[in-house]
Amino acid sequence: MLENPLIQQVLFEIMDEDVVGFDVLSVLINTNEVTDDEISRQLDVKLNNIRRILYKLYEARLVDYNREKDEETNWYTYTWKPSLEKVPALVAKKMKNVLKDLKEQLELEETNMFFFCSDCEIKFTFEDAMDSGFRCPQCGGMMYEYDNKKDISILKEQINYLEDEFNKNPLFSAY
């Protein structure tokens, strides 16, 4: 399941783009139940970093934990285990949101005329450009008409790719 690029992207975002998170998940999947301290030693990563990743995964409900108190030291030991059955639903929800945003952007691109400040590299709608007298509000430079055909093409490609991935992957068929 973790080999799927869409799943990897969503997990990457959940873990704040920390690639060590994939190593943490691999340890959890391979051992099924492990303490944060054992993960830290096994990966040779600081315990605080491991805990931060585990908390992010827990917030997304992708891991669970058990807490046990050592009667001699009064310290708590947290044993973590994967709970990846929610991954397909999480990815499906994220994909639907991304598709919705891409389709809204595509509609905006297809129904508007744009102008561009080449100095600031900022794109403006016709209305915004007209309101500022076709002068960039950032630098005062002239705005020029922007041909957004390439942007439209890229958006369509992204939408088609995501829809194809979503439709062909059996993990997401229930969503």
From Swiss-Prot:
Gene Ontology MF, one: DNA binding
Keywords: DNA-binding, Transcription, Transcription regulation
Domain HTH TFE/IIEalpha-type: 3-88
InterPro entries membership: TF_E_archaea, TFE, TFIIE/TFIIEa_HTH, TFIIE_asu, TFIIEa/SarR/Rpc3_HTH_dom, WH-like_DNA-bd_sf, WH_DNA-bd_sf
Taxonomy, superkingdom: Archaea
Pfam families membership: TFIIE_alpha
Nucleotidyltransferase found in the keyword field: no
PROSITE patterns: HTH_TFE_IIE (PS51344)
One GO BP: regulation of DNA-templated transcription
Subunit structure and binding partners: Monomer. Interaction with RNA polymerase subunits RpoF and RpoE is necessary for Tfe stimulatory transcription activity. Able to interact with Tbp and RNA polymerase in the absence of DNA promoter. Interacts both with the preinitiation and elongation complexes.
Domain remarks in the Swiss-Prot or TrEMBL record: The winged helix domain is involved in binding to DNA in the preinitiation complex.
Family: Belongs to the TFE family.
Role this protein plays: Transcription factor that plays a role in the activation of archaeal genes transcribed by RNA polymerase. Facilitates transcription initiation by enhancing TATA-box recognition by TATA-box-binding protein (Tbp), and transcription factor B (Tfb) and RNA polymerase recruitment. Not absolutely required for transcription in vitro, but particularly important in cases where Tbp or Tfb function is not optimal. It dynamically alters the nucleic acid-binding properties of RNA polymerases by stabilizing the initiation complex and destabilizing elongation complexes.
The protein's name: Transcription factor E
Originating organism: Methanococcus maripaludis (strain C7 / ATCC BAA-1331)
